[in-house]
Amino acid sequence: MVADTVHVGQHLAGHPSVHLFGHEIVLDVSIPALILSTVGAAFLLRYTLSIFRLFLELTVLPGKDIKSFQSRKGETWAVVTGCTSGIGLEFARQLAAKKFNIILVGRRQSALTDLSKEIESKYDVHTKSVTVDVSTPGSARDDALTQLELLAQNLDVGILINNVGASHSMPVAFHETERSEMSRIIETNVTWTYLVTRSILPSMVARSKQKGAPKSLVITIGSLSGRIPSPLLASYSGTKAALATWTKALAEEVKPQGVIVELVQAAFVVSNMSKIRKSSPFVPTPAPFVRSTLNSIGLPRGAQGRPHERTPFWSHAILDYVVGFAGYVSEMAGIKVILGMHKDIRKRALKKAARDEKKAE
């Protein structure tokens, strides 16, 4: 049976009425209240579904299989920058465990040699090493980029992990930051990331644009300091924000050619750069952080609504999601909390430096 046309009218008391199946139904609410209730219900539904999606992505939904980026087992290579400690070291190990050959990029040749021996003996894969100080422009860095470009042209490079990064030695006001420190941060976090990606990406595009070819993957490690402006780390925070915009633009450029480009957002992780030595639920060691990153390719988790970004580790994802939930209010609250935290860190760092200086006298 087909229902009569639904007709919304105005009842004598100013309440809306609906004609359905030949009967008039009077709603005991005013039209403005009905509109507000409908809008409120829509927002409630939206956020309920969003939270449910976050829960599913953190618990049961799988990301894209990392092995899908391999052409043939044992022949595909992954490039990992900043690979001799922390997150980069763990990326090299876990990708090798998945039978990717590894191109190791780092500053210290001795550390690269030791890591190369470890990976080849433990995981039965091949390695190559490129030694470079990424923070220093010049012929040595240019030579390293040329070397990486040639390796990408001659090997089946399917993954690039832009991990290497630099931050301030301690929180500091922007107008008091040494120029040398500022340059080191910009050259490492932005300039090198752009240049190394430019060197390797053409070969990845050529590899993946063919019909039936495996996709390629570029992962750049970002920071929630770029997501939430971080006073007293302004230079570092700005470089990480730049990487987010660059990633989104680049991802759309190369998506039709079969290359996936993602920015992975991270909060604190136990590492030399963070200067944190003890793990906690909100500060993981590199191993679980990298595992969550490789297991969630394509899933935004805490970065919902931000294309080509993801926040993979569960506690970082919840933090990112909460900050975005209330928009301006939560972001401003986050900025104030971060400023207070950085003031405290700076105060303690200056006291320690003073004690060390006194001991050295």
Swiss-Prot record:
Entry GO CC: endoplasmic reticulum; endoplasmic reticulum membrane
Which leading EC class covers this enzyme?
Answer: oxidoreductase
Against Gene3D superfamilies, the record matches this protein to: NAD(P)-binding Rossmann-like Domain
For this protein, the record's PROSITE patterns field holds:
ADH_SHORT
Q: Please name the pathway.
A: Lipid metabolism; fatty acid biosynthesis
Protein's UniProt name: Very-long-chain 3-oxoacyl-CoA reductase
Catalytic residue positions: 236, 240
Localization per Swiss-Prot or TrEMBL: Endoplasmic reticulum membrane
Tell me, what is one Gene Ontology molecular-function annotation carried by this entry?
Answer: very-long-chain 3-oxoacyl-CoA reductase activity
User: How does the protein associate with the membrane?
Assistant: Single-pass membrane protein
Q: Name one Pfam family in it.
A: adh_short
Q: Which residues cross the membrane?
A: 32-52
Q: Which UniProt keywords apply?
A: Endoplasmic reticulum, Fatty acid biosynthesis, Fatty acid metabolism, Lipid biosynthesis, Lipid metabolism, Membrane, NADP, Oxidoreductase, Transmembrane, Transmembrane helix
The record's family statement is: Belongs to the short-chain dehydrogenases/reductases (SDR) family.
